[in-house]
Amino acid sequence: MTGADVVAAVQRAVRDVGAGQGLWSPGDRVMVACSGGPDSLCLLHVMRALASDQALEIVVGHVDHQLRPSSRDDAQFVAQVAQRWGLKHRVAQVTVRGTGEAGAREARYEALKGLAEDLGAQAIATAHTADDQAETLIMRWIRGTGVRGLRGIPTRRGVLVRPLLQVGRRQVEAYIEAVGLQAREDPTNAGLEPFRNRIRHQILPLLKAENPLIVEALGRLAENAHAEVEALHHLAVQGASREVLGPDGGVAVRLELGDLPKERGPRMGIFSHRLRWAHERVRRALDGKHGLQGHQLGRNHVLAVEEVLASARGREVRRVSLPGKVVAVVVEAWVSVVPETWLTTPPALEWEVFPGETLAPGGFTFKGWSEEVTGEGQGKKN
């Protein structure tokens, strides 16, 4: 394959995934998160090349983690590339030392969110490749995961989009060489820390020796898992909830559980999907349109709520804290998922009340009655 063939193939892959999965719309401003490394520099070059055809405006965001003495040089390099290509750019500095992988990732995404807002971008494109997807699946499999975890890195989550997920690292390197770009190299990527580096340098090469197409195979696994989870999710939550909107923009969700199967396996599977969906719905309302940080619900959270639900007695109100300042409130056979703040300062809500008692999210009970007025003006309660 010639250099021109490589360039055409990579650009076609990005264009197809962008159009096929609705990663952007004509007229959007897309911020490419560029570290200066091969993957992100490749993505920036591709997006710039496709901008006219896709009717996009490309801008650049760079996050300086301040972990290496050369990090300022990386920021300067990205700024020079953006200026040379006539692209608006912004740089953010974050402090991630001592926060661990999860903390560093959260700080990076929060910084990207701020840069996107500053630049007025509708989407943030990150340069995760097919190899990154494979490494993620291997890492989750080793640590333990379910079908949801096998979905891997999503092509889109909120404003985050990953147009390079169908492109392998070797293709990226060939693209960079073909267009004559010189990328920055992060020396920490060559070591065996963190865990992902050991997967990249030790485990994945062994798997490639057994199956040279292992990266593509794991990519298909992620796509299949995503499709199956989405299908089951749709069936599980359809008509199974009631939402309440608060004046503060928050949302509470009350789950209907009367239709759950009696068998524990199917019951837990459907309940898990409903609870996760409700949690994500409440979190999305709290996070606003960006929703960069998912505060994912783990199996331990689902089991905790299920245990409380199984032992519920009478009108006793019991609560289980969930990630992201969300609470599951259990009353009898009802589970309501509400923002934590609603339990201390309930917002003013409109709620339809019928004669008798009505349960509302948060464990609140409304008592209602109807009154029939006779000709003599005397009321009769029902």
Language-model segments: residues:
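Short, surface-exposed loop/turn segments at secondary-structure junctions
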Residues: 186-190, 212-215, 291-296
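Non-catalytic, well-ordered alpha-helical scaffold segments
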Residues: 41, 135-136, 197, 201, ...
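Core alpha/beta nucleotide-donor-binding catalytic domains of modification enzymes
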Residues: 1-210, 234
